[in-house]
Every structure is written in structure tokens, then in C-alpha cells.
Amino acid sequence: MKNRWSDIEARRWIQRGRLAGLSEDVSLRIYTTRILGEDPQLVLHGGGNTSVKTILPDTLGQLTEVICVKGSGWDMSRIEAAGLPALRLEPLRELRAVQEMDDVRMMKYLRGALLDPAAVNPSVETLLHAFLPHKFIDHTHANAVLAIANQPEAEKICRKIYGDRLGFVPYVMPGYPLAHVAMRHFGSRPEVEGMILLHHGIFTWGDSAREAYDRMIRYVGMAEAFLRSRRKRSFSVTPKTGEASLEKVAPVLRGALASWSADGKRQRWVLDHRTSPGIREFLSSKNLKRLTGPSVVTPEQVIRNKPFPLLTSVPSADLSLWAKRLRTELDAFQKRYGA
């Protein structure tokens, strides 16, 4: 796990922010949010979120304690100030005493705390960020952490790796319930530098943007090192000869995927073929069905990744037979997907 912090870049972001009327806190929050979001080992498909607690003027010009948190729909790798809506912090902290609230009421409450009523919706995990006392908080769905946090004995493994430096929280649906569970766990161990949320991801925090970011990179790196130490062997790639070429397979696949719209028009798809040594190595595994069967590594990725893929094979000769089998496989996939 490479630490991409640069003092030079940090100063540049501060200077840009000053010209745009942004505080140093917000400028550095933008900078580290972006370098987190640009690393696919940490964040995929717009997942994760970040926050900073700071002081900003409200509509009347009065200095107000706020939390700027990633807004829904914003990609961390392209975040701008508008993607970090500011909310009054004190009204959010008052919710620590309210044990239950559904998502609709919670979002209405959060919108009522926005400094700018026209701002985007704040993250569903805003209250988790608000309930914790730390100035800068980072949250990612790091691949290496999830590879461990999804194991049957995940907490035991995590304690072996991290000792007492991190807290460990069982999976809870993001939103109001998770915010309260995380708050209670932190309250029992306020010395920790972050949290592993089982089947979900990792939080780190700090008094500065760099401290929170450094901790994220360090703890994800420790997970990577642990996995490397346990790796027995790579998947073996089985060379195959005589398969139908991509040029012959693609039209058959497009035909099978085509469908009729409600207004009677034919809907066809443009295919995007992707391959690499890593992809071919993975697809050559004898355990491919098992490896692709358990769904995404965290429920937070299901919106973009979807729960499972359709696996099919290409025959070496008769594509007409494969086309019939593909149609059967697609029908079964659609029924499973819609169940």
C-alpha cells in the first residue's frame, strides 16, 4: 500500500483553496479524499466517505462548529468543495441520546442541519462521523481489509494483526444503527486509532488530514502484508487452444443480450471487452465458481457491482450450440437476479 501524501501537493491544495475562499481544513479534506478515492485498492465505484470538523460562518456570518462530510453521489477521486456539504455539528450530536430513527426521518433531520439548504444530501454515514470526536475521519472499503474482515473468525484474525490499535465492530446496516453501535464501541476504547467494521470496511481518524490518511495506509498495508504471508500459490493459468475467437463470439453474445423495449423497439448492447494477465489468471482458476459465488466483498458495493456474475464458457467449434446454452444460462441468471 503506497502512501501518496505529498507536502508539496498539500500546500498547493491549500493555496488553491485560499483563492477559492476555502479554509485550510476543507482544502486538505479535499486533497486526502481525492488520493484515497484514486486508489482502487481502497475505494471502488464511488464508495467510502470522509469528513472534517471545523469552524465556518453561517448565513448570518456567525462562526459555527460544523462537520463537512462527503455528499451522496460524489466520487471521492473527483471531490470538490460542493461535495463536502457542511452541517451544524451540535444538532447532530444531540441525536446521540435518541436510540431509534428510520432513514427517512434521519435524512430530513440531516438536511435541516445543513448550512446551505440547497446542498447535496450528506452521506448516510454522517452521524457515525459526527458522533466520533476526531477532527479528520477517513472511511474506505479496502480490498485487503475486507479479505480478512469477511472471514468466519475475522475479529480473531484482526486482533492478531492489529492488537489493541483498532476497534472491531460487527456488521450493522449503515445509517442510524451503525452510528450508535460505533459510538458505543469507541466509548469503551477511546484510545484506538480506527475501527474495522466486519463485512464493511475500515475507519481511521486523526487530528490532521495527514494523520488520518497515514493511519489508513498503514493499517491497510498491514492487512496486505498478512495476506501475502499466508498466500500459498497463485492461480495456475491453463492455456486453451481452439476456442472461438472474440470476433466470432461477440455478435452471438450481443444477440443473446438483445431484448424488446416496452414501445416495441429492439434494445441492443455495446460490449466492453476487458482482459489482462490478472483477469486471465483469475478466470483460469479451477475454483472460479466458488470464488465468484459469495457475492460482493461488502454490501456497500452491490449498487454498482451487483450481487453475482454470469459465468459461461466458449466451445471450441460449434457456436450455434453455445448460443442455445447461453440463452438457457441467461434465462436462469435473470430469474435468479430478479428473485
What residue ranges belong to the model's regions?
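Glycine-rich flexible loops
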Residues: 1-339
